[in-house]
């Protein structure tokens, strides 16, 4: 049964959270807070020439086929829809909001030159910092488009362009030295572990978990899903999703379940909630998207609302044949207790307290929430 709140239940949980925070205002600030969450945003300019004038994908390649479609999408989004979403997100910030978290794909990429790619990162960060988060830390994690375009630009790895441009900004925003796209920070008693899903470093991830054993909630933040949820041909785009990584993937999954972690992810341009209970513990995943592709996507209706709708197996996919795909999803399907999937696009608010952790979804630039998901509810024994 999907744990979605009606208005009365939401108010009751809010009251419990306030009581659980204690009498001291300092303790309340530490234990009860909110985070504004943006999914993929694909910052771009309506004019293709601003960032993409030099990008010429090889004739006949997949990139050449999808590039015109991508550019039409970017033009449509950044001709008004994304500006409206950003303005609405600014209004979502409350006195208890501690920071703004962006789940990767800050920019579109496809720049062809290192200097232009760096400028796009600078401009994308600057736009959301100024428009949404001028007075709070703005924390974008790395997505595939943030290092997109090609492996090298001007004889320089794109990932190095990203590191040189973004890590100093993250260090300034968080007030700590960030020297790697996989990093961790604390918000009160909670751990936010942000990972580079493009180049996953499992030993580093496990080390950061080991260094923070005494936390209330563990949030693992990844652009790609921690638990694969898409049955399309590109479902391999999840954390440690290559077949060669299956041993470390299972090890990390087991550790996250043991810690009863909450995964905050993006990439698929969908809203997805998945809750899994295993012999080791529990892992809850929420996938968000802020790529507002069309007006109607602000009110998109659910496509799946039960575990039976999880992960339709594709006929073929890169890295996996059909039997291998069935085996992969078969590792997760028996543990799934709740599942929800929608094409709705917008922004989210994460509310964290002793009594509960909830995620509230707002479609497009709408002021009224569409639904609230319960990620943890201590009062119901679901912590």
Residue ranges and their predicted role:
Residues 40, 104-105, 143-144, 223, ...:
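Active-site glycine-centered loops adjacent to acidic/histidine catalytic or metal-binding residues
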Residues 58-60, 64, 109-217, 237-260, ...:
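Extended active-site neighborhood of metal-dependent phosphoesterases/phosphodiesterases
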Residues 27-115:
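N-terminal active-site segment of His-dependent metallophosphoesterases
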Residues 33-35, 43-49, 202-205, 229, ...:
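Short, solvent-exposed loop/turn elements at domain surfaces
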